[in-house]
């Protein structure tokens, strides 16, 4: 058994139900688990850290990323594009990725997250070029090398340009191929035990790049295996128009009809929900990953986070992909989220502490 003692912490921000902020306190851990907090705890442990000059808070949890995009960040030709044009341009680069690109991009992106206080990374990987190998296995190996908790997704796309989607043919798969590999990934890598460092979610890319059948089967399979569901939703007005044109309903109604609401589901972005839809998210416990920097860069809009929090919608914080953020610092995201909503909502905006709680406990939920 390994033990850790944080001795005489100046300030401990717990983010617990009572919002306790403690001073001059010790924290004692065994095998990575906090066992007790208080004054004058055991004086010895395998590792003792003098916390006299430190503030301590829970590790940040990143709820949406595209680590593979780390190798395509800061490209001048896409800096002023909005989402659909941005995607179609970058797919021509992303269709060439392989296992080594994934390894290096994952190490770089997760390393940057760790550097800025993030201890858990969820990644939404949905680009699987033919012959690229076991890309999620590569990601889990990179996470283990760094020591970060990894929540990876078996993403997917089955609609290419010929089907009215955005990606090229070479990066989409059939529903049957996706389902078979989803089972493989879950059985090979998902660890549901408490404290697990490795979990899997199913995450079709978006309602404009996958078929209703893929969404339906993914929801059924996820619940058979007890894994969570994730996708992009209500990120742009273009998406809203696409859904109304092709399916005759707004995005959330479409997803709900396919089984995509509930406490095991969370959506990235969630910018363009109306009042009724926000209430439905709260009623069903469906979560939202808030990505303020990406939303600003791609001119997608501002998520209605103050209203979500007031209604009880589960909200976490996320950096989104490095190609739409040009970085992987969740601490920067936290500061920008605070400032953005101060500008947009004034006194109704979440406080700095509420944003920290969103990036820790809210994201973990």
Task: List PLM regions with ranges.
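Metal-coordinating catalytic core of metallo-dependent amide/deamination hydrolases
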Residues: 131-270
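Active-site gating loops and adjacent loop-to-helix segments of metal-dependent hydrolytic enzymes
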Residues: 71-102, 131, 159-175, 237-262, ...
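Alpha-helical scaffold segments that flank or form the walls of functional sites
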Residues: 73-124, 129-149, 179-195
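His/Asp/Glu-enriched, well-ordered alpha-helical/loop segment
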Residues: 257-264, 306-365
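Glycine-enriched alpha-helix->loop->beta-strand junction motifs that scaffold or abut catalytic
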Residues: 147, 222-228, 260-263, 280-289, ...
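N-terminal metal-binding scaffold of metallo-dependent hydrolase/deaminase domains
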Residues: 1-43, 54-55
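C-terminal helical cap
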Residues: 8-12, 106-113, 287, 295-297, ...
